Amino acid sequence: MTAFDLHAPFVPKGDQPQAIEKLTTHLQSGHSRQTLLGATGTGKTFTMAKVIEEIGKPTLILAHNKTLAAQLCNEIRSFFPNNAVEYFISYYDYYQPEAYIPVTDTFIEKTASINEEIDMLRHSATRSLFERQDVIVVASISCIYGLGIPAEYLKASIPLKVGAEVDQRQLLRNLAAVQYTRNDVDLGRGRFRVKGDVLEIGPAYEDRIIRVEFFGDEIDAIRYVDPVTGETLQSLEGLNVYPARHFVTPTERLEMAVEAIDAERTAQVEHLEGAGKLLEAQRLNQRTRYDLEMLREVGYCNGVENYSRHLAGRQAGEPPECLVDYFPKDWLLIVDESHVTVPQIRGMYNGDQARKKVLIDHGFRLPSAADNRPLKSEEFWQKVGQCVFVSATPGLWEIELSENRVVEQVIRPTGVVDPEIFVRPTTGQVDDLLAEIQERVGRQERTLITTLTKRMAEDLTEYFEERGVRVRYLHSEINAIQRIEILRDLREGVFDVLIGVNLLREGLDLPEVSLVAILDADKEGFLRAERSLIQTIGRAARHVRGQAILYADNLTDSMEKAISETERRRKIQLAYNKKHGITPQPVKKGSDNAILAFLEVSRRLNTQELEDAYEQADDLPLESVPELITQLEAQMKEAAKNLEFEEAAKYRDRIKNLRSKLLGQQSP
């Protein structure tokens, strides 16, 4: 038995038992790379969970976007309710990196909005990795970016133990040194307050409050308490308080870093002047001197991450520490949808370096700023011991690395067969598709439509709306959380048809979808390649009446291969169903997502969105007004807390107007 305790209302069926056994055997034999070739709807996540339980190692599950990571984390948490299942994605709600455009001589300052709740989940992940063995972290590609030095982070943690003698003043100084701020009025995450002999800390990694009670200089009690009621949730003998930020720099290291930065500044200014770049040299000298002064005085400056090589004591070109460095020596990596995720790992470094080079060449940053970067692909894979690639369409790179350790999982436990595929001419395709949609609406089933261009998707959405179809258009400007909400609304029947371009392929778990329509299926290219077609067709593979219609005037090689592979899988499933007397059963899966619910509670509209919503309040449905009032109240309280009383008064007046509107419309 391992530390992982899997709970599931079903047992492995179909191809799952042999896939679990083979993957487990490969891993226990010490093989470093293997692939699970699992068709859509065959229960790949359950197979992953069983392998994790059997192997018993801390595991990182890597997904290629936040939406898929949230979906995976929710499923894995349901399988392992008693283990630490963590969620690690980028904590930016909005991020615009600094950049310089030489052609127009335009410098763009870095602007970012950090989601505090996601930051808390990131801290929770690293805390679990320090304290437990039964840890599963579901992460997006952001896990290959720098995260501070694990040893320094752990060394900076503050141990507290009942009965220990502690200098209270020194303890408060220690908390301030690891980025906690004192606030005796409003205790929140990353803050602490003192009331008599009681110290309360809002840890960076959870929403419970740590209460430390003293008797003189002796710690008398340590408790977790509810942040609202103050009720005791748990009494403890001891704990570690981890820093409020992952980047922790000891004083002596900071002093050494300042010297190194200053030396690099001198050398680079001389280099630029020697090359005749006097403006660039002056710019770099001025900017870096200001940053150095800030670092000496307060230990921080804007854009401090650009000095991370010096602050961490790394050599030039040395890879930064990231999430994988927080894992113990023996851990397991599972790469979900590997045919997309693996190329992402390769692409992150090159894009980052192209932007940094321009900044360095024009005197905005020192050359060492190039080392504030994500891992290179080869650096990442050097840190990985054992790995399982998971995909319905794995890439050649994964298959070659796995040698003969490619495990197929094609048979679905539910007996659901791969979609029937129909190829129809493009003439009259929209009206033909409308008839298909109406048929499915009558059966309360959903439809996905994929187009080649954004313009066509918009026009198609408008056309269907005019004909009474409840339709939405999923486009690239929709953020991760809104995307999850749209997919949930599709599942719950708020609308019936979802149209997109390259947004409807990997990992979408939509059992209600019975039809996938692919327009311009014969236009060869990335969006209509064999792998893309198989993935898109697979979105209907969870429904007992799943069908895919490919609108095309020619049969391309990619279409032939995709149709052939889907037909091969259909035959395998049909033969299995016949042999075992299985009648296909619809997939029953709730649409709730605990991660989504958490993020929805935490999400606040930004100021511009609130302005727009308020201006359009007259057009809002009545049931939406209370939500807008709640958002405005949150902004009003935030403004008052920051002593911005004029801003708070503006929100108060708007809330009054909205409440009047609400009362006026509700009265008979």
UniProtKB/Swiss-Prot annotation:
Q: Which residues form a coiled coil?
A: none
> Gene3D superfamilies annotated for this entry?
P-loop containing nucleotide triphosphate hydrolases, UVR domain
Tell me which residues make up the UVR domain: 626-661
Q: Name one GO cellular component term.
A: cytoplasm
| Motif stretch (Beta-hairpin) | 91-114
Q: Where is the Helicase ATP-binding domain?
A: 25-176
**Binding positions (ATP):** 38-45
Q: Which CDD domains match?
A: DEXHc_UvrB, SF2_C_UvrB
Kindly list the biological process annotations in GO that this record carries.
nucleotide-excision repair; SOS response
Spell out the SUPFAM superfamilies in the cross-references: C-terminal UvrC-binding domain of UvrB, P-loop containing nucleoside triphosphate hydrolases
SMART domains, per database record: DEXDc, HELICc
**Keywords of the record:** ATP-binding, Cytoplasm, DNA damage, DNA excision, DNA repair, Excision nuclease, Helicase, Hydrolase, Nucleotide-binding, SOS response
Looking at the record, the residues that make up the Helicase C-terminal domain are: 429-591
Location comes to: Cytoplasm
Q: Quote one Gene Ontology molecular function term.
A: ATP hydrolysis activity
The job of this chain, per UniProt, is described as: The UvrABC repair system catalyzes the recognition and processing of DNA lesions. A damage recognition complex composed of 2 UvrA and 2 UvrB subunits scans DNA for abnormalities. Upon binding of the UvrA(2)B(2) complex to a putative damaged site, the DNA wraps around one UvrB monomer. DNA wrap is dependent on ATP binding by UvrB and probably causes local melting of the DNA helix, facilitating insertion of UvrB beta-hairpin between the DNA strands. Then UvrB probes one DNA strand for the presence of a lesion.
The Swiss-Prot or TrEMBL record describes its family as follows: Belongs to the UvrB family.
Provide the assembly information: Forms a heterotetramer with UvrA during the search for lesions. Interacts with UvrC in an incision complex.
Quoted from the entry, the domain comment is:
The beta-hairpin motif is involved in DNA binding.
> What protein name applies here?
UvrABC system protein B
What organism does this protein naturally occur in? Acaryochloris marina (strain MBIC 11017)
